[in-house]
Amino acid sequence: MFQGAAALSLDAKGRLTVPSRHREALQATSLPAASSLVLTAHPDGCLLLYPAKAWEPIRARVMAFPALDARFSVWKRLLVGFAEEVEIDAAWRVLISPELRKFASLEKPVMLVGQGSHFEIWNQDTWEKQLRQLTAQTQLPPGMEDFAL
C-alpha cells in the first residue's frame, strides 16, 4: 500500500527518484516485474503512477467504455491515450516523458502522493493549491457524513 506525501525534485532529464520508504511496497505489489510501471494523465492535472499489475484492470474497464459516448471519450483519451509503460532504473528513477511533464506542468519541485494502490504526481504549486481548497471545505462529500477520525 502506498501512502504518504513526499516533496521530490525531478532531475535534468525529467526523472523522479522513488523514495526508499516506497520501494519495498512497490516490489511486493509489482512482482514479478517490480520495475514495470504505468504513468498516465488524470483530469485534475496530475499524473497517476501504477504498478503494471494494478493498472491492467483499470485499463480494461476504460477500454470497455462506450466508444461513441462523449462522456466516456474524454476519460479514454486521458487515461489510455497518455498511458506509458515506464521502467525503474537501477537507481530507482522513473523517467517522465516530456508530454506527461507538460500535461501536469511538472517542474523540478514535485509531490509524490500515495493513494493506496498507486501514486499521484503533482506540480508542487498545484498540489499546495489543492490542499488549500480541500482544507477550506466545510462539508463532507456524500457518503462521508458518518466519517470520524
Regions found by a protein language model. Name each.
Residues 14-18, 50, 92-96, 100, ...:
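Short, structured motif recognition centered on aromatic/hydrophobic residues
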Residues 25-26, 57-58, 127-131:
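Short, charged/polar, Gly/Pro-enriched secondary-structure boundary elements
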Residues 3-45:
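A positional/architectural concept
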Residues 29-45, 105-122, 126, 139:
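A short beta-strand-loop micro-motif that forms or neighbors metal/cofactor-
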Residues 28-30, 61, 107, 133-134:
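Residue-level signal for well-ordered alpha-helical positions
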Residues 125-149:
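Short, Lys/Arg-rich amphipathic alpha-helical interaction segments
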Residues 84-93, 98-107:
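Beta-rich strand-turn-strand
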Residues 47-85:
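Helix-adjacent hinge/juxtasegments
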